[in-house]
Amino acid sequence: MPRMAATDRRAELLEAAIRVMTRDGVAKATTRAIVNEAGMPLGVFHYCFDSREQLLELVTETLTERYVAEVRGLFAPHKEIRDSVLDSLYTFWKGFEANPREHQINYELTQYALRNPGFENVARRQYEIFLGAHAALLELAADHAGIEWTVPVPVLARYVQSTLDGLNITWLVDRNSDDSRAALELLADHLLRHTTPRET
């Protein structure tokens, strides 16, 4: 195995974990399966991560940041708030449809963490990451559009996450893209009912 810096090994193991989970599911992403995927000895895993729990949390952080990075730039100053919200939802959805198995990791990971003692914190941390990402995007949208949300941002973030969870799982079952996109538009319209111009 070529000599690699610890940060590079860690990054490669993280990507290997995502590949294994996408291909085989979370339950089969054992430490041995991950190091085999990365072409590294088992001892490297324990050198790079404190625990499998830590790795699972980092998988959530990594995937969420990728999704957020895709939509963050869609919120621009003076852009209509409806356009920004819809563009962000549609961009997320396009990525979801293009790579559903990767997104499916999130739901498998939640169930795995809730069912396996010692991993409860992974599910809790997972949704803290999701809700924090939505809250940050909602605040960014408001800042650029010059509006205020009339409902507390944490409540709106929970509403967005709950709606997307339902849409994602339903689409994984029936693959009805037209109705899913229509539901996203309803979500955007409902969010915009809870705005008011920002006082200057």
Q: What do these predicted ranges mean?
A:
Residues 16-23, 70-74, 105, 109, ...:
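Solvent-exposed, amphipathic alpha-helical segments
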Residues 98-104, 117-143:
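Amphipathic alpha-helical packing segments from all-alpha helical-bundle domains
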Residues 9-12, 19-54, 58:
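Helix-turn-helix
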